[in-house]
Curated annotation (Swiss-Prot):
Places the protein is found: Cytoplasm, Cytoskeleton
Residues with Phosphothreonine modification: T518, T521, T535, T536
Gene Ontology annotations for the cellular component aspect, listed alphabetically: cytoplasm; microtubule; microtubule cytoskeleton
Residue(s) carrying Phosphoserine: S190, S534, S541
The keyword Cell cycle appears for this protein: yes
Name of the protein this chain belongs to: Cytoskeleton-associated protein 2
Ranges of Polar residues composition bias in the record: 1-22, 107-128
Modified residues (Phosphotyrosine): Y538
The family this protein is said to belong to: Belongs to the CKAP2 family.
Biased composition, class Basic and acidic residues, residue ranges: 159-170, 359-373, 500-514
InterPro entries: CKAP2_C (IPR029197), CKAP2_fam (IPR026165)
Organism: Bos taurus (Bovine)
GO process terms (BP): apoptotic process; negative regulation of microtubule depolymerization
Subunit note: Associates with alpha- and beta-tubulins.
Amino acid sequence: MSTPAIPQDLQLNPSQRTQSAFREQRRQKLKEHLLKRKTSFACKQENQMLLSDGDQRVRTSEGQIQEGKKVLKIKTEMADKENVGRPTGIKNNLTVEKNCIPLKPSNELTNSTLATDPPNSEDNNQTLPLLPVKDDPQSQHRTLSQTFHLKNNSKKKPVITEKPKHDANVPKKPVLGAYRGQIVQSKINSFRKPLQVKDESSATTKKLPATVSKATKPQPGDVSSITVKSDRASHMTSTTKFASTTSQIRHLVRPPIRSQHNKAQDAMKPGNSRMSANVTVQKGPREKELNTVLSGIKTSSSQDIKGDKTLSKSMAAGMVVRPASSSNTKLIEKSKSAGQRSHTTVKAAVDSRWTQPKETAEERKARLSEWKAGKGRILKRPPSSAVTRPEPETQNEQPVGSFWTTMAEEDEQRLFTEKVNKTFSECLNLINEPIEEMRHTIVDILTRKSQEKLKFGENIEETSAAEEKIQEAHTDDTGVDLESGKLEMENNPPRNVFQDCEKEQDDKVKDPTSDVKTPSTNTRAGCLIKYNVSTTPYLQSVKKKMQFDETNSAYKELKFLTPVRRSRRLQEKTSKLPDMLKDHYPCVSSLEQLTELGCETDAFVCRPNTALCGMFSEPDPTEEE
């Protein structure tokens, strides 16, 4: 079977890869890639060999660079539309290779150890040996300018490290009279009087223990060795100053005393600077440290003494032209006293610096008060105690008067509290143990009330007997009696509920048929009326108000009596009900039940219930013991 012919619309254009130009281009690319790998491999091998030797520099072969240039020319001549941006990238890569390969060993200057002496550090044009290090990954990408700066920095480092560290023993607080590390005699003379010292050697020996203790102070653990610093520079400056002063004195025939004194002060400055030089010792045993420190201090002190002697000799030689007078001797004495003062000031500064930590808080306060007194900052107080003597007397008189007034107030308060406590105790005793007189009064009140009720019942019987004895007429008579009783309740002052309760009981005893004709006749026969005994917060507040009234002081509690309707059937079964379903407040139907509840000393207020009969519709508050 033959393959079907593809229509012209669906045929693809012939690929450009089949063309000879593109094949040649791909062949050149492959050759370039292989050459690149070959050169990189050769460079790696050379680097490894140079690192193992440690003394040879890495150099690139000129043949490899020429081959790279040829490949670059071929790339630029080819016009490839698909790879327009490629030649520039390859060119950059080749230039990076060309620049970075010969400069590889120059970056080891940072990690190389250079052993150079300070005298030889002046030769800036000397070439330093290069020690290649494997640990520096950035060494492969450094330019010529970077290597040049690294060389200069490496040459400057030893010079910087050899500079003396003057900050090691400089005190934290500035020394009085010092200017730029040197003590100026003119500043000292402005605020300090010259101290009398026998000779200079005694001052230097006194300064010895302070410097020894400072030199033997423990250094940090990582410091391996400390170099002893020399005073060559200071000696040179001192000699030059001596020469200049002597020459000036010889030229002047009659120099003024002021200028000579200033020159003597200038000549003493190098000696002072020598005394304040730092003396440090190499790490070792304590005995060696002490010996070296002692020797250094002795040499410096002897040099100072020699300098002072030469100064005095030169001054004397310069003044030979002028006739001998007392001014020359005064000048020499002044120069000596200036030297002695400089030594004593250095010693005083050192001593004060070492004695400050031992000072206690009390000494500081005393020193502060003295300083304030010197400055005139003390609080002004009365000048004499004689003026202030009468003041305590007046102050004592005032408390005496206030004492008697407070005593009187305390007595009044005590009497008042005793009276109040007495009244409270009497009230409590009356509540707990009532007096017989009170009981008799209560009984009299109850009997009088009962007699009134009996009379009221007899009147009812007389009226009922006068009327017809028919049952209907009897019922009419009872209705009239009830209406008349209602009118009496409206017209008369409010009465106690106990009267109503006793009246009901009397009616029940005298006429058993009257139960049907009570106000509860309107309700069903299965219900009965009782009085609920309850209290409210309002009653408690009323009771507190009533306690202040003497007439009602006998009442213990104040409660409400409210008529309520209860079911007979449920009342019979209340004993079987749980406590949750029972009434929280007790209900009574007679005076005897109230006495059983222990409410003999309570006062009751009748609260009407509008849901029941009309007789309870109007509020009739009554109170009774």
